[in-house]
Amino acid sequence: MDYYRKHAAVILATLSVFLHILHSFPDGEFTTQDCPECKLKVNKYFSKLGVPIYQCMGCCFSRAYPTPARSRKTMLVPKNITSEATCCVAKAFIRVTLMGNIRLENHTQCYCSTCYHHKI
């Protein structure tokens, strides 16, 4: 019985050290390397058709913070956390038709603005 307690103690100590190391890194440290700023980049897939097609790509900011009590009272479904985010979107674009029937937006300027992931 004493053997199993020592074994369990070693496993718990190892797990504790691993979790401490894991939580000491900022979020996303393992998955992302410096995210580039929001700017125009060539879309390689559509540019193969002969005309260079540009697309806005890159990172903006996002943050989350506790919802103020005053705001929670007015919510239909109260939430403890409020989040904000901006996405890299086109400020200006030119409509382009490729191969007679493919209509695309060729971005000409980019900036960080409100995210509309649901927008088609």
Curated annotation (Swiss-Prot):
Its main location: secreted. InterPro entries: Cystine-knot_cytokine (IPR029034), Glyco_hormone (IPR000476). The keyword Signal applies. Pfam families: Hormone_6. Disulfide bonds join 35-59, 38-88, 56-110, 60-112, 87-115. The keyword Chaperone does not apply. GO terms for cellular component: extracellular space; follicle-stimulating hormone complex. Glycans are attached at residues 80, 106. Residues 1-24 form the signal peptide. It is found in: Secreted. It comes from the Eukaryota. GO terms for biological process: G protein-coupled receptor signaling pathway; positive regulation of steroid biosynthetic process; regulation of signaling receptor activity; thyroid hormone generation. One of its GO terms (molecular function) is follicle-stimulating hormone activity. Gene3D superfamilies: Cystine-knot cytokines (2.10.90.10). Keywords: Disulfide bond, Glycoprotein, Hormone, Secreted, Signal. Transmembrane segments: none annotated. Shared alpha chain of the active heterodimeric glycoprotein hormones thyrotropin/thyroid stimulating hormone/TSH, lutropin/luteinizing hormone/LH and follitropin/follicle stimulating hormone/FSH. These hormones bind specific receptors on target cells that in turn activate downstream signaling pathways. Belongs to the glycoprotein hormones subunit alpha family. Heterodimer. The active hormones thyrotropin, lutropin and follitropin are heterodimers composed of CGA, a common alpha chain described here and a unique beta chain which confers their biological specificity to the hormones: TSHB for thyrotropin, LHB for lutropin and FSHB for follitropin. This is Glycoprotein hormones alpha chain. It comes from Equus quagga burchellii. The lineage of its organism: Eukaryota, Metazoa, Chordata, Craniata, Vertebrata.
